[in-house]
């Protein structure tokens, strides 16, 4: 079993670029498409570690869906981001949906 560092609804930062993001899904390993031989790195531990579907904002403040390796993400220490309130709202909405029981007919 592969353990992930981050959970759905958690806010994270891109380690190199510093962008704030919200995790919307987690894959136990890279699963978008099979990489070609040219794309295979010498160390495939990156592909076999968790990968995350993350929503970030572009320069205009529009949401962008990005697929990132766990090694590319860091913890976010601030709970509120006045410069990016929509990401705060998204994270809170996801967390509330995960906590709320669903009604079944």
UniProtKB/Swiss-Prot annotation:
GO terms for molecular function: DNA binding. GO terms for biological process: response to heat. It is found in: Cytoplasm. It comes from the Bacteria. InterPro entries: Hemimethylated_DNA-bd_dom (IPR011722), Hemimethylated_DNA-bd_sf (IPR036623), HspQ (IPR022866). Keywords: Cytoplasm, Stress response. Pfam families: YccV-like. One of its GO terms (cellular component) is cytoplasm. Belongs to the HspQ family. NCBIfam families: PRK14129.1, yccV. Involved in the degradation of certain denaturated proteins, including DnaA, during heat shock stress. This is Heat shock protein HspQ. It comes from Sodalis glossinidius (strain morsitans).
